[in-house]
Amino acid sequence: MNNYPTALFLMGPTASGKTDLAIKLALQCDCEIISVDSALIYKGMDIGTAKPSNHELQQVPHALVDIIDPLESYSAGDFREDALSLMQEITDRGHTPLLVGGTMLYYKALVDGLSPLPSANPKVRAQIEKEALENGWQALHDKLEQIDPVSAARIHVNDPQRLARALEVFRISGKSLTELTKVKSDPIPYNIKQFAIAPLEKSVLHARIEQRFELMLESGFEQEVRKLYQRGDLHLDLPSMRCVGYRQMWEYLQGTMDYEEMRFRGIVATRQLAKRQMTWLRGWQNVTWLETGHADNFERIKAML
């Protein structure tokens, strides 16, 4: 057995009850929270991301919340670097890092490390986009299928950002995205205890998602997105504006759908996010499952510390 310090992962789909449980652990078990959520990183995006309240954040600080403007980008690599640094600081204080959230790509980057992918090259990307303009994205998808059939099967023709990135990686490095992503980093120096929380029944999760979206609408979500919309420098191609709920509300403000359709699509998009998160989690190794709202969840995690 190694002498590595313990770190806790509290994973789960959106609206599963992670935050309440995490705050209780932080208050009673000398844990410090690191957010693992690609939406909570953005300033000014509070209601639609179900960000912990100001009172909760004052009571229990969450690292990696409100760290960038919605115009800025933040990668899984940025997360890994920040999280490892924070985990070291927390263990140096004699506390336990508690990583909480549902962005499974961030967890994967932290645990498995990052592949040695080349940095973005504006000239190469511009050439790819020029080809797309001339020949269409389908033609570029066909090219990807020839050089990297595994990535082509995974990346949809209507996902130009990922499609362009896969082609860019090949043109810069001469190696496919699939080939490069097989290279892994060394394991991180922690004994990781992994928990996932979710309702037993999918219908319960769906009901929680709908209730939470309704509460967001009642709490001023439209006004929050309108403020972002009126800035004039944000658009739907940004990762921040592709967050569930924000895209639908943005399109409503543009006049491309009515209020009821926005509400319906926002709930559906959130359910689809939860489904993707559950798919990740079902394939995750060494996870202890907790049922949302169960009385002994706190004690089960505490017993592992």
Curated annotation (Swiss-Prot):
GO biological process: tRNA modification
InterPro entries according to UniProt: Dimethylallyltransferase, IPT, P-loop_NTPase
Positions contributing to substrate binding: T14, A15, S16, G17, K18, T19
Pfam families given in the database record: IPPT
Start and end residues of each stretch annotated as Interaction with substrate tRNA: 37-40, 161-165, 242-247
Catalytic reactions on record: adenosine(37) in tRNA + dimethylallyl diphosphate = N(6)-dimethylallyladenosine(37) in tRNA + diphosphate
Binding-site residues for ATP, renumbered to this chain: G12, P13, T14, A15, S16, G17, K18, T19
Site residues (Interaction with substrate tRNA), renumbered to this chain: T103, R125
Keywords: ATP-binding, Magnesium, Nucleotide-binding, Transferase, tRNA processing
Cofactor: Mg(2+)
Top-rank lineage group of the source organism: Bacteria
EC number in record: 2.5.1.75
Disulfide cysteine pairs (residue numbers): none
Record-level Gene Ontology MF annotations: ATP binding; tRNA dimethylallyltransferase activity
Function: Catalyzes the transfer of a dimethylallyl group onto the adenine at position 37 in tRNAs that read codons beginning with uridine, leading to the formation of N6-(dimethylallyl)adenosine (i(6)A).
Annotated family: Belongs to the IPP transferase family.
Subunit: Monomer.
Name used for this protein in its record: tRNA dimethylallyltransferase
Organism: Psychromonas ingrahamii (strain DSM 17664 / CCUG 51855 / 37)
